[in-house]
């Protein structure tokens, strides 16, 4: 029978003498083994509780972290544990602002190339030029008359930018086939 570190520590705390048989095959050693298993589990739980302070290492309270950070959002649904931890850690570290560079950077973090420009439609309208999108389908006869001639599949990008934009701002999304 292998002697664990917690079992050894427990046996060393007991007094010496003939009444205290500390040999590995004694009943006292078996009792110390049972107690040390519980203490080892509690020590592991205490170490994990220290890791729960940060979303990148959280397992038990990851749901609470996600709720606090507003996750899952339109870009991070149904991920693995490590993907969810990474998304929560990135959201925790993110410091946003209202500049155009921030929105271009945010789109680049998700693999999109965009450029924001002023629109001629008014002060509160911004044109979001999206480059290099290859996920689209052409309209068919089964679509209704309100369907555009090309239907683009970048709903995650539009959802993401709409979530972080100021409430008074209107985004007009324009898709370009080539690079900028």
Curated annotation (Swiss-Prot):
Component of the baseplate. Coiled coil: none annotated. Signal peptide: none annotated. Induction: Expressed in the late phase of the viral replicative cycle. Expression of late genes is activated by the viral late transcription activator C. It is found in: Virion; Host cytoplasm. It comes from Escherichia phage Mu (Bacteriophage Mu). It holds the Pfam family Phage_Mu_Gp48. Keywords: Host cytoplasm, Late protein, Viral baseplate protein, Viral release from host cell, Viral tail assembly, Viral tail protein, Virion. The keyword Zinc does not apply. This is Baseplate protein gp48. InterPro entries: Phage_Mu_Gp48. Its main location: virion. One of its GO terms (biological process) is viral tail assembly. Disruption phenotype: No tail is synthesized. Transmembrane segments: none annotated. Disulfide bonds: none annotated. GO terms for cellular component: host cell cytoplasm; virus tail, baseplate. It comes from the Viruses.
């Amino acid at each position: 029978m292998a002697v664990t570190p917690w079992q050894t520590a427990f046996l060393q705390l007991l007094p010496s003498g003939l009444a205290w048989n500390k040999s590995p095959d004694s009943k006292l050693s078996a009792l110390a083994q049972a107690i040390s298993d519980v203490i080892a589990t509690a020590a592991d739980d205490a170490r994990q509780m220290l890791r729960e302070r940060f979303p990148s290492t959280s397992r038990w309270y990851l749901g609470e972290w996600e709720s606090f950070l507003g996750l899952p959002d339109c870009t991070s649904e149904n991920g693995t544990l490590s993907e969810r931890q990474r998304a929560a850690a990135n959201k925790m570290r993110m410091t946003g602002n209202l500049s155009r560079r921030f929105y271009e950077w945010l789109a680049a973090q998700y693999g999109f190339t965009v450029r924001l420009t002023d629109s001629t439609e008014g002060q509160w309208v911004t044109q979001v030029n999206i480059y290099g999108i290859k996920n689209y389908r052409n309209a068919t006869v089964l679509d209704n008359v309100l369907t555009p001639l090309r239907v683009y599949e970048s709903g995650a990008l539009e959802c993401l930018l709409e979530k972080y934009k100021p409430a008074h701002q209107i985004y007009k999304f324009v898709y370009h086939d080539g690079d900028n």
